[in-house]
Amino acid sequence: MKKIGFIGAFDKIDLIIYAARILTELRKRVLVVDTTILQKAKYIVPAINPTKFYVTDYEGIDVAVGFENLELIDRYLGDLESSYDIILLDIDSSEMFDRFNMQNADKLYFVTAFDNFSLRKGIEIIGDIRERLNMTKILFEREIIKENDEYLNLLTLTYPIDWNREKFYFPYDQGDLTAIIENQRVTKIKLKNLSEQFRDSLLMLVQEISPEIRTGDIKRVFKEL
């Protein structure tokens, strides 16, 4: 079972759910865990009887909300380890990073835009992490600006973070935001209305999470969704 962490203050639950949707279509058993303070998944993922903590199905994805560690999810489900191939965790605090033992994750992504809150709050989260870690950047920008990446490197220069060479750029524009909001409104995951750059980056992200999946199979799913 792979454990993948998406770290940062930026709103990333939709991105995580989109990646999970593609993976489930490719016969991967995926659990999305929203550990964030706002628990946005509670409001965008339909649930029949939402309680303080629960797991619900959303288009083949299991989504967990309200849990404080993986042990509680395991107790809730009965057997977490054998139930899923991949767990994708949305984390926006160093406390939850520790509670979910993300230092042992198979992959860690730092997700941010370059507004002051997303950037500085996100850096504050990873600044509180004590272990030295490898992380991959997922950057949301209206256009790719080299200086933004260099600025992020400068701000984290003294932090115990080794940035991987590869990085993912997602467009931060009105068209994709409109498509995401429409998906939330109809509670349906549709990828066709997203921009080509967004879909290309999403494809590469899914491929990195599960490199055994063929690119052609991922492209087929994009056409179907």
What do these predicted regions represent?
Residues 2-13, 29-86, 92-95:
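P-loop/Walker-type NTP enzyme "switch/lid" segment
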Residues 212-225:
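P-loop NTP-binding site
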Residues 146-200, 204:
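Beta-strand-loop-alpha "switch" segments that mediate conformational coupling across diverse proteins
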Residues 189, 193, 208-215:
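Regulatory and interdomain segments flanking nucleotide-handling catalytic cores
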Residues 19-28:
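A short, Lys/Arg-enriched amphipathic alpha-helix followed by its capping loop at the start of a domain
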Residues 47-66, 75, 125-134, 157-166, ...:
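Inter-domain helical "communication" segments and dimerization helices
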Residues 17, 86, 91-171:
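Conserved catalytic-core segment of NTP-binding enzymes
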Residues 12-20, 122, 202:
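Short, highly selective alpha-helical patches that border small-molecule cofactor pockets
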